[in-house]
A protein has these predicted regions:
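The substrate-binding groove and active-site-proximal loops of carbohydrate-active enzymes
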Residues: 64-65, 107-120, 174-186
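Contiguous, structured surface segment used for ligand recognition
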Residues: 1-106
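Mature, folded catalytic cores of secreted/periplasmic enzymes
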Residues: 60, 127-128, 182
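Generic, well-ordered alpha-helical scaffold segments in large soluble proteins
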Residues: 13, 81, 126-129, 133, ...
């Protein structure tokens, strides 16, 4: 199931960036992909759970990971090889092979929305960029005395009161405020 989702994700990215629509389909065991195909697969011989091997040949691209996560990180490498939003009629990738695995098991970034609210579209873009750079952990700081950003139906006052502030300090260590209501929640 995850391998299929990875294939659909890659096909959608290629469609958005080049305008080409790719078909995704499962191959029967032992069968060979047609020329020009991008093949995703699992290979338990790859040494790291998040490792992958990406091979580009004149007639096909093969991407194997030890797990679906490894395939996902290989897709990110492939994404970085395709110019974003080219709408070109073709994309030429140099032939070669990349064998990659993470040096560190924990690779993450933090987003503090407790102190400063970010719109949902920004958060989605941020997560997409984390994936593009092979980060595997997103630490989302949702609560703080400056803002409560997660709705809990049983406690509505947390967001009615805690998600908003009536003003924001201007600069540092000043008594000046902008008197603009600010905040939000997810």
């Amino acid at each position: 199931e995850l391998l299929k989702r990875n294939a659909e994700f890659l096909a959608e990215y290629i469609s958005q960036s080049t305008g080409h629509t790719l078909q995704t389909e499962a191959l029967a065991p032992g069968s060979e992909a047609p020329k020009g195909a991008i093949t995703l697969g699992l290979d338990p011989a790859i040494g790291n759970r998040e490792g992958y091997v990406l091979t580009v040949k004149a007639d096909r691209v093969t991407l194997n990971g030890q797990t679906e996560n490894g395939v996902f990180y290989g897709i990110q490498t492939l994404r970085k090889s395709i110019p974003a939003e080219t709408k070109a009629t073709s994309v030429l990738l140099p032939a070669g092979s990349i064998q990659d695995e993470p040096r560190f098991s924990y690779r993450g970034m933090h987003l503090d929305v407790g102190r400063h609210f970010f719109p949902i579209e920004f958060v989605k873009k941020y997560i997409d960029l984390l994936a593009l750079h092979n980060m595997n952990t997103f630490h989302w700081h949702l609560t703080e005395d400056q803002g409560w950003r997660i709705e809990i139906k049983k406690y509505p006052k947390l967001t009615e009161i805690g998600a908003w502030r009536d003003r924001t300090v201007i600069g540092r260590n000043t008594e000046e405020y902008d008197n603009t209501r600010y905040g939000g929640f997810y």
